[in-house]
Amino acid sequence: MDWLLACKALILGVVEGLTEFLPVSSTGHLIVAGSLLNFTDEHAKTFDVVIQLGAILAVCWEYRRRIGSVVSGLPSRPDARRFTLNVIIATIPAIVLGLLFEKTIKAALFSPVPVAFALVAGGVVILWAESRQRTRGETVARVQNVDDLGALDALKVGLAQCFALIPGMSRSGSTIIGGMLFGLDRRVATEFSFFLAIPIIFGATAYELHKDWHLLSVDALGTFALGFVAAFVSAFACVRWLLRYIAAHDFTAFAWYRIGFGLLILLVGYSGALNWTE
């Protein structure tokens, strides 16, 4: 593995880890970063899947006690079974739509310009949602604990997650903001979003690796391993930071970041500085 490829792997791993669980779209950032770094060949898709796996394993490690409690409690505890059922219910819509429209979405939307429009649109939605939260004043959210989620709440969040099939919209942003609009406390919506990422990303990883297993090679293992570790470490730090951040802040700063980043992508693209308008 040459040093330039190692640097690209490290950068992309950190980008994935820092953006997977923030409402800013990790897929959108990887598409833009991959284009800037000229890391867009057939191995790039498999690499993206590997670093996403690194990021999700960071969440599994952060919530290992909770996950262990749920798994061990499935035979005997109703709350563990209800939580597991809610995760399954919320996961199904995105899986179904993803399988149906995967090729269309990748052909039409997996490039920087569509990502830019989605970033801006998502930022506007977050600003509207936060404005709506402020107008409600000190009204207490209906769902204050992730264990109090009902099946209908889970389904609503799962439907919101479908917007994340559009690169640039953000899976975490769709589920967190959607959850808040549907009556979930900010921390509850954020934690449920973390748990929803586990089956979605594990499923996507298994699907993509099965489909592109022939792209895996001994020569690529070093690159994949470096990106994986970078994604794990940065995602672990980011999850811990985000949980502290939301205790005292809303998501307005992320909304303005999305809008600014999206407009910058469009400005750079349409100015001719970089050729990514197609």
Curated annotation (Swiss-Prot):
The parts of the chain that form a coiled coil are none
Please name the top-level EC class of this enzyme. hydrolase
- Enzyme Commission number: 3.6.1.27
A GO cellular component annotated for this chain's UniProt record is: plasma membrane
Q: Which reaction does it catalyse?
A: di-trans,octa-cis-undecaprenyl diphosphate + H2O = di-trans,octa-cis-undecaprenyl phosphate + phosphate + H(+)
Where does it reside?
A: Cell inner membrane
Q: Which InterPro entries match?
A: UppP
Provide a Gene Ontology MF annotation, just one.
undecaprenyl-diphosphatase activity
The record's family statement is:
Belongs to the UppP family.
What protein does this entry describe? Undecaprenyl-diphosphatase 1
Q: Which organism is it from?
A: Paraburkholderia xenovorans (strain LB400)
Starting at the broadest rank, the lineage of the source organism is: Bacteria, Pseudomonadati, Pseudomonadota, Betaproteobacteria, Burkholderiales
